[in-house]
C-alpha cells in the first residue's frame, strides 16, 4: 500500500469544503460528506492508478491524475511510493484554471 500525503493546499481545500457544508447543511451532513471524500482518497493507497490522467481526458501535458469524490475532484500525483494529494476542488469550479492556469475554450472563441 502506498502512503497518502496531503499538500497544504489540499488541506486548505478540505477545510473550505467543511466550512461551506457546515454553513449550508449543518454538522451531520458535513461529517458524512467529508468522510465520503476521505474514504475515496484512501482507496488510492491500494489502487493508485484508479484515477484518470489529466492528459488522457483533456490532452494536457500534466502528471496529475484525478478521481471524483462526492461532488469534488481530487487531484493527485504518484511520487515513488507516495500518493500526493494536490488539490480537492468542487466539481463546479474551473479546476483546470485553478490547478494549471489553463482557461478552457469558450464559444466566443469560435465566433472569431
Tell me what each language-model feature is.
Residues 1-36:
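Arg/Lys-rich, positively charged N-terminal/basic patches that mediate binding to nucleic acids
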Residues 9, 38, 62-68, 73, ...:
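Localized chelating/binding microdomains
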Residues 18, 38-45:
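Structural signal for well-ordered, non-membrane alpha-helices
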Residues 24-28, 44, 92:
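Residues at alpha-helix boundaries and the short loops/turns that link adjacent helices
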Residues 32-34, 50-54, 105-106:
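Juxtamembrane/interface motifs at transmembrane-helix termini
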Residues 42-68:
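A short, surface-exposed loop/turn module that caps and links secondary-structure elements
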Residues 72-112:
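Enriched for short, Lys/Arg-rich terminal
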